Each structure stands twice: as structure tokens, then as C-alpha cells.
């Protein structure tokens, strides 16, 4: 694996910060995108944008199909049993809140323990902290 070659796919890493190469360590919050993703997002917003699952007009149906086809692609990529196991969230914080709330409401009981390390990102500490109250 050639890290330099992979890094060249990400336009953000062409930027310099005070004459130094950019180092980005907050991908759990916001992931940098390779150019191919930026181009595809731009194409979607320029030519295909519509709400997903909210209407029956052409653009809405096309956007919904694209969304569901993406769910199927992810299912195959991670070898999930069913495409409905795939849940898209806006980021790690929303995903961790969702997991904590589902486990808290449906599975965890008084006396159960959830172990996390002191090294956890704040987004993984807060949902469990609130859950214990």
C-alpha cells in the first residue's frame, strides 16, 4: 500500500498550514474526501439532488434508488446479511448516540456495565455517560 499515492487522491492534502503539510486527525468527526467523491457529490447536487424517500417525482425516485443501491453496495462490501442492517448517519457522534440509545432502551439493564477507555473521543464518552443517569 502506497500511502503517498493514496494521499494524492485527497485535494485537501495539497494545502499547507504555516508552510507545513496538513495532518488531519479528526476523521471520526469529519472525513476528508478524495477527489472522485468530491466530483460525484458535485454531480449529484448539480444534476440529481432531491430528498430521499419523500416524493414520487423523477428526481426523488432517482435519488431514492441511488441511496438504496448504495445501501446494497455497502451490504455486499461488509458482508452484511441484509441491506436493512445498514444504517447511514451523519457521523460518528450521531452513530454512537444511536447505538447507545438502542442498547439502553432495549438491552442494557440496571447493573450492566459498558466499558470504554480514557482515550475515547468525547463523542463516545457522552452517550454512555447520559445513559447511566
Region spans (language model):
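Pyridoxal 5′-phosphate
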Residues: 1-133
